[in-house]
């Protein structure tokens, strides 16, 4: 009798469509704010980052909460954001916020070690920037999900592709 193993994947991904919507929303809010009229303050987005630009450093500090609120309203976990230093030079200020995705090797090793230490009948294997957990029983997999959720990692994790 061949038993098919149950499995799921652990990933850290962003919904880029929702990130773009949140940036658009934050720009609309900026344009309607009296204190930002004529400041050239703007949020711009590329594949892996969001850029904040304004005339003054204090404006960047005021823009960040607007962006965070727009992202949070769209279900984007703020742990995915890695804000850089604010750069100020001759009449302008910029900040780049990196959008972090994928589970890096260091965290993947921590999670696979945690699964091993749990003494459950499950295996964890690193697959690029995600982790696959396999086991015979669904409840063992659910116990592993709970175990991982109980840790506090500094990136958001999603549990996807559940098969049993």
Residue ranges: model-predicted function:
Residues 59-100:
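Helix-adjacent hinge/juxtasegments
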Residues 36-66:
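N-terminal, charged amphipathic alpha-helical interaction modules
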Residues 44, 94-98, 105-164:
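Positively charged, low-complexity, intrinsically disordered RNA-binding extensions
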Residues 55-60, 102, 137-140:
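Helix N-cap motif at beta-to-alpha junctions
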Residues 6-13, 49-54, 90-99:
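Short, hydrophobic beta-strand segments
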């Amino acid at each position: 009798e061949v038993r098919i193993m149950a499995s799921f994947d652990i990933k850290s991904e962003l919904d880029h469509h929702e990130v773009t919507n949140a940036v658009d929303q934050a720009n609309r809010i900026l344009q309607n704010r009296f204190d930002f009229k004529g400041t050239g303050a703007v949020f711009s987005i590329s594949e892996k980052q969001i850029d904040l630009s304004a005339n003054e450093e204090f404006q960047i500090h005021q823009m960040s909460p607007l962006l965070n609120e727009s992202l949070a309203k769209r279900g984007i976990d703020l742990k995915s954001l890695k804000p850089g230093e604010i750069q100020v030079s001759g009449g302008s200020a910029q900040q780049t916020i990196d959008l972090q995705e994928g589970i890096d090797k260091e965290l993947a090793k921590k999670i696979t070690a945690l699964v091993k230490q749990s003494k459950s009948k499950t295996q964890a294997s690193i697959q690029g920037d995600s982790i696959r957990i396999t086991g015979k029983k669904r409840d063992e997999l659910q116990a592993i999900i709970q175990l991982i959720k109980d840790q506090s990692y500094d990136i958001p994790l999603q549990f996807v592709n559940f098969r049993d």
